Each structure stands twice: as structure tokens, then as C-alpha cells.
């Protein structure tokens, strides 16, 4: 799978009114709903630039000047600080709005690219990454025997929904923490990585992994991916009493393996697995999104869960298009909208 298309050319598939709203309406793009101004005069069939949530609209780019007063965040990119507005899920007039729609000519296009075209670079947009909460120096780039942890949202896979409903998948709770990868090379040396970088052996990530003996569960050529959660991490939104890992994927020689093949002890540290019948892929995309909305209590009693990740069983044949979208991770997610809006995400 290629890197995430933060900004792409998409076609508006529908326009819905908002009760009691004179100036705004809802545009449908893929599986997303985005609140837009009626003065944009958009209609079904129009091609537009769609910006996904987590997009950082840089303050130095005049195309995004109007957004900066809504709030800004700063992140480090290489040796530079970049400040801008980060797109989050919001609720307006009782309607969830996810992402941003702009006209292509607002971005400087004098022609209309095909639907699906990745225009992230042209839009000059970055994916916002929260600062690493754990200590430890970066000593190299991500080089583990696995893919970087990533799962597309179901809203981007609407064209494959009928195929997805024919496949077997394991539903697991998406746990809100810091993504970490632990691997063992062929010489038996253990390495630890953040989402994009290798960290030194004295990092807090490594120390916590060792505390739970994850390093002793690995074999050469194996990698375990997990969320580090608890006090001091991502505001501890799940209110856990202590820091701990939640394993969500295990790999051997760049191939993801099913949970029943994980090393002894690792399933005890896994993210919670949900009932496959209760969370079978049925109905419409909107039905599934609505079902996840409000999910709670699977990690911490009575607290909202972040969402669900469906991991496809590895022995299934996928169409070329779906395989390209999912990549080697072979999973996708639905995020709990109530969780997003409650936490300003």
C-alpha cells in the first residue's frame, strides 16, 4: 500500500440538508460526510479536493490562512518546525463532519484530475503526528521485518465493501496509545521503533517492553507491534492505572501471522478481541459506522473505546485493488465518532 492519501481528488456522491441550517449542508465523499457551505454551490458529480482528518494545513501557505484562527499545532519535520491547523472530527448541528472539501481551483488546479488522484504534495499538506511521549533518542529509520502500523478507515474503502463482506476477519478493539514495534534480527539482537524511527536501547519504549518480557517472546526475524498506553501517554484517555503494552500484530519475515500462531505469552498482552458474529461485516458502510459509534467498556469499564480494527485472516485471496489498499497489514478500522469528538481528535 502506498502512503496515506491525505488529499485526493474525489467525486461528490450526494448532498444532504441539515435540519434548521440555512447556510450549510452535508456533502458525501467516499464513505465520509463533510459539512460545507451552501455558497460553494457544489452538487453530486462534482470533483473536489478532499482532505482527510489529521491533515496539517501549514500556516505559511496562503491557501489555508482562513483556517489558522480555528487553532494551531506545531510538529517537527526533519530539522524544521511546521505550524498549522489540524483537521479533526467535529459535530455541527448534530452532524459529524470529517475532513475538508475545497474546490480544485482554490488549490491552483487549472484542470480536473481523475478521481482518486493523490494531490497531497500539490496541496502542501502533512500528516500531523503527536510528539513522542516516551524518552529515547532516534538512532535510525524504521527497518523492522514488517510494515509500518497503519490501517485505512472503512470510509475510504466503500468501493470494496461488497468484497469485504465476503471475507473472514477478526475484530479487535483499537486502543489509543503510542505505536511501537519490537523486533529481533537474525543475530538475536532486539530493536525498538516508534512509528517512523528506530530508538536507542535505553528508550522508555524498550524498557517497558522488557518489563513485560516481550523481548524474550520473540524469535529471530520476528516483530511484534503494540500500543503503549497508560499514564503519561496520549493524555491516558483510557484512564489506565499503569503503563502497559497492547499487542495488535505479530510478523515473521515480513509476513503477518494469525493470532493462533503468536509466541506463547503474547496473546495475554493482546488488544481485546471482539465477538466475530456480533461484529460481522454486514449491512451498509453507514450501518457499521453507526454501530461502532458509542462503543465503550472493552478496555476500561464505562469509558469510550477508540474504535475497532478488523484483521483479515491471512489465507484469503483478495482482489488486486483491495490488496493494494490494505497492503501487507491486511486490516482496516472504524473509529468511534463519539470518542473523536469527546477528545477533540
Model regions: which residues?
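Core nucleotide-handling region used for phosphoryl-transfer chemistry
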Residues: 1-345
Amino acid at each position: 500500500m502506498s502512503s496515506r492519501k491525505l488529499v485526493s481528488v474525489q467525486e461528490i456522491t450526494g448532498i444532504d440538508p441539515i435540519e434548521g441550517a440555512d447556510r450549510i449542508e452535508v456533502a458525501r465523499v467516499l464513505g465520509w460526510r463533510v459539512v460545507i457551505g451552501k455558497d460553494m454551490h457544489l452538487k453530486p458529480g462534482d470533483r473536489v479536493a478532499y482532505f482527510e482528518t489529521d491533515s496539517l494545513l501549514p500556516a505559511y501557505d496562503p491557501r489555508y490562512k482562513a483556517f489558522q484562527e480555528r487553532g494551531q499545532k506545531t510538529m517537527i519535520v526533519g530539522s524544521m518546525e511546521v505550524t498549522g491547523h489540524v483537521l479533526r472530527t467535529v459535530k455541527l448541528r448534530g452532524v459529524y463532519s470529517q475532513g475538508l472539501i475545497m474546490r480544485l481551483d482554490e488549490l491552483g488546479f487549472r484542470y480536473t484530475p481523475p478521481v482518486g488522484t493523490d494531490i497531497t504534495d500539490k496541496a502542501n499538506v502533512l500528516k500531523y503526528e503527536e510528539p513522542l511521549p516516551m524518552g529515547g533518542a532516534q538512532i535510525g529509520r524504521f527497518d523492522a521485518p514488517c510494515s509500518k502500523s497503519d490501517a485505512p478507515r472503512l470510509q475510504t474503502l466503500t468501493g470494496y465493501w461488497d468484497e469485504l463482506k465476503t471475507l473472514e476477519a477478526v475484530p479487535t478493539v483499537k486502543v489509543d496509545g503510542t505505536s511501537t514495534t519490537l523486533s529481533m534480527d537474525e543475530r538475536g539482537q532486539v530493536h525498538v521503533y516508534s512509528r517512523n524511527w528506530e530508538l536507542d536501547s535505553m528508550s522508555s519504549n524498550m524498557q517497558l517492553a522488557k518489563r513485560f518480557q516481550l523481548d524474550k517472546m520473540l524469535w529471530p526475524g520476528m516483530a511484534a507491534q503494540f500500543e503503549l498506553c497508560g499514564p503519561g501517554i496520549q493524555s491516558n484517555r483510557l484512564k489506565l492505572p499503569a503503563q502497559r503494552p497492547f499487542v495488535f500484530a505479530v510478523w515473521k519475515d515480513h509476513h503477518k501471522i494469525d493470532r493462533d500462531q503468536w509466541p506463547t505469552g503474547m496473546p495475554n498482552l493482546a488488544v481485546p478481541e471482539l465477538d466475530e458474529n456480533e461484529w460481522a461485516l454486514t449491512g451498509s458502510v453507514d450501518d457499521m459506522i453507526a454501530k461502532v459509534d458509542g462503543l465503550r467498556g472493552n478496555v476500561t469499564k464505562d469509558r469510550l473505546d477508540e474504535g475497532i480494527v478488523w484483521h483479515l485472516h491471512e489465507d484469503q485471496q483478495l482482489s488486486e485493488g483491495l490488496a493494494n489498499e490494505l497492503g501487507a497489514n491486511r486490516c482496516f478500522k472504524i473509529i468511534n465518532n463519539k470518542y473523536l469528538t469527546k477528545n477533540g481528535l
